[in-house]
């Protein structure tokens, strides 16, 4: 289903961890454990730039777990990488040929439009400086297809 919708330009923007309720429930959770999820079509409509100011473009054939991380969190690189690597290892079926963890350091202070009226309503439904997973037709976690159907 994702491939059909994706071919028509469908955008995935999942920032449920940034609703008021989720932020209250997760107030003691490290920021890097609360990612958003987007697809590569999102990046076509809402450009995000790496820390060298180059526009990010992700191929649908990329099999990696792609993380976009604001450069201001570079000092937490080890913790962030360990957390997502353990998540990837836990969620990856041994027979599933999932790629590597791929970290792309992005320019700090960028915003993501959430398409969700319950996400940061005072900030016009934008999320600033979130760590974001980028799902592709061939990549991200094994349940990506199920995730986007819900």
Predicted regions mapped to residue ranges:
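Nucleotide-cofactor and metal-assisted catalytic machinery
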Residues: 1-150
